[in-house]
Amino acid sequence: AGLGAPYWAPEARGTVTGLTRGSGKGEIARATLDAMALQNVDILMAMEADIGKPMTALKVDGGASANNLLMQLQSDYLNRPITRPEVIETTVAGACFLAGLGEGVWASADEIARVWRSDRVFEVQLTDAERAERMLSWQLAVDRTLYTPS
């Protein structure tokens, strides 16, 4: 398993906490989405600490961005709006745009930037208290994975 950025702990073990006898596939799937979103919070916080200022706008792309619940969780936990583009496979689109720029299809990078379109903006729905509770639960879960008895 291991735990990547910003912890860099290859010895960490995977865990799912908070399960009850009534937990099923739905709860496991939701825990996975929560963990994905919360790991991104840790990474973004580390990035903001490195650059010394908050990032106010966040745009997402890639296959995972098609999941509305994941994007809403991301917005809620990061406490900022998340913007998803109409074309989520931006790596491929970017390669095509750069090739077009090189061949003269596009006059400038500014012209390419004007092609970008937003599909949806996910606005924060969690209260500060709810967010603080979930962040504390996440940090406790991370701490459990990092603990290695002697």
What do these predicted ranges mean?
Residues 1-150:
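Glycine/Thr-rich phosphate-binding loops that ligate phosphate moieties of nucleotide
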